[in-house]
């Protein structure tokens, strides 16, 4: 299978019961069937003074249109929530998240095991500069619906599931700051509404792989300055296939099967910096097979479509200055602010980091350096370096251990089960024949559910 196909699969596999103040929620009439965000008027800020509200303030909420609870199994209800967040230049903007409600009731797993208090924020690696690839819409499409088995798994465990469109309204793929802000504010928005979640005792965990890990890691490092109110509520984050340095990823994928990540990533990060975007466009060639039109076409492509369109293409052939574009000071304005992890804060909650040492998209040396940086200042990290597997394969190989780690944290048993303080770095060999889950000291019902994954 071509790598871009595997990346596409990677990006895909993955009752309103609480009272709230109607005056805080602004609704707009929408079709009962889902529309792409670019065509749906619901995906817009309200015509009021929303910019002066606090980050995480809910601006609109609606039951998810169409048949989303049929597409996603084990969900009793689903809601779209539009909320105020902050872009990469620390200006007010908005984003959308989708909240899936598990099966509730006194005999449900959500009630028995978690007291309806466990919220998993899963950041989908949608890896696209097209706003219509956002999970709140793509989950309905043939491409996206085939990947909701991971949603089903989380919901079957009794977890409330938060799935943010963390790239924001400009589809700012690879822009770390807005991705982190939008992730944190989606959690704030959900906690402010409840929607069946026991918010007085809520535990929240984050999970993401590849592009989803980008959002989850940035949320974790930004929280200390941007969302200190969440530090006692968030119990941990599982991040795999981490991309600490956007430039390194662009250089790795150029000319390879996954080259489509390049145009989408550059278009995405520069969407947060209009002057940088303007300069970038001026540096694109205007003729030949790799020209401006071809490059900018990525703005309307999903990760799978971009993977097919740019497979094997040398990314730097589009630019007048070739690979030096990544070292151009005018481009570095965006990359240095928004594309390099580890310089905005230190995660204050436990981290489970995992990556293949053979990762062909994000060199593991950069992840090693990031972890070492955090370890030097007291972060609590379990880091597993898998000796086998490619970037997409590692997503599949380590999904079950990640779920185990997350569910243990959400039951409040992280310290008891994992017994790690500070940094623990392990070299592991996790392949398709390895036992994916090992029973530890946790709720039997959760382990029984894990065994069915």
Regions found by a protein language model. Give the residues of each.
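Short, surface-exposed "cap/lid" segments of acyl-processing enzymes
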Residues: 87-154, 165-167
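Alpha/beta-hydrolase active-site loop
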Residues: 146-150, 173-196, 220-221
């Amino acid at each position: 299978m071509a790598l871009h196909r595997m990346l596409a699969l990677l990006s895909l596999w993955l009752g309103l019961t609480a009272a709230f103040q109607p005056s805080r929620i602004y609704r707009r009439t929408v079709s009962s069937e889902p529309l792409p965000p670019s065509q749906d008027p619901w995906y817009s800020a309200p015509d009021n003074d929303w910019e002066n509200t606090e980050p995480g303030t809910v601006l609109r909420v609606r039951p998810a249109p169409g048949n989303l609870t049929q597409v996603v199994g084990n969900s009793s209800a689903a809601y779209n929530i539009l909320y105020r967040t902050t872009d990469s230049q620390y200006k007010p903007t908005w984003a959308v998240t989708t909240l899936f409600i598990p099966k509730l009731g006194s005999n449900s797993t959500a009630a028995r095991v978690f007291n309806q208090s466990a919220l998993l924020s899963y950041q989908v690696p949608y890896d696209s500069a097209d706003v219509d690839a956002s999970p709140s819409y793509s989950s309905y499409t043939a491409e996206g619906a085939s990947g909701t088995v991971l949603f089903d798994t989380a919901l079957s465990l009794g977890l409330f599931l938060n799935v943010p469109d963390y790239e924001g309204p400009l589809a700012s793929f690879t822009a770390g700051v807005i991705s982190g802000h939008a992730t944190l504010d989606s959690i704030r928005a959900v906690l402010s509404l409840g929607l069946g979640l026991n918010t007085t005792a809520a535990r929240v965990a984050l999970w993401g792989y590849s592009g989803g890990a980008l959002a989850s890691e940035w949320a974790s490092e930004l929280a200390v300055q941007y969302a200190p109110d969440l530090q006692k509520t968030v119990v941990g984050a599982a991040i795999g296939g981490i991309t600490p340095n956007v430039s390194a990823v662009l250089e790795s994928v150029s000319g390879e099967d996954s080259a489509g990540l390049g145009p989408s990533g550059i278009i995405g990060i520069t969407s947060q910096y209009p002057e940088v975007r303007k300069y970038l466009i001026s540096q694109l060639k205007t003729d030949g097979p790799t020209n401006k039109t071809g490059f900018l076409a990525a703005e309307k492509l999903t990760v799978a479509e971009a993977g097919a369109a740019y497979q094997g293409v040398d990314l730097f052939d589009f630019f007048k200055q070739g690979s030096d574009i990544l070292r151009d000071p005018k481009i570095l304005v965006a990359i240095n602010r928004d594309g390099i992890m580890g310089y905005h804060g230190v995660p204050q909650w436990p981290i489970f980091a995992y990556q293949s040492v053979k990762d062909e998209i994000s060199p593991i040396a950069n992840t090693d350096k990031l972890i070492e940086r955090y370890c030097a200042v007291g972060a609590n990290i379990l880091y597993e370096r898998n000796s086998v597997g490619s970037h997409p394969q590692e997503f599949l190989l380590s999904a079950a251990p990640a779920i185990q780690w997350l569910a243990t944290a959400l039951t409040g048993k992280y310290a008891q089960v994992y017994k790690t303080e500070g940094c623990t770095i392990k070299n592991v060999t996790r392949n398709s024949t390895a036992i994916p889950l090992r029973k530890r000291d946790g709720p039997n019902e959760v382990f029984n559910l894990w065994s069915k994954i």
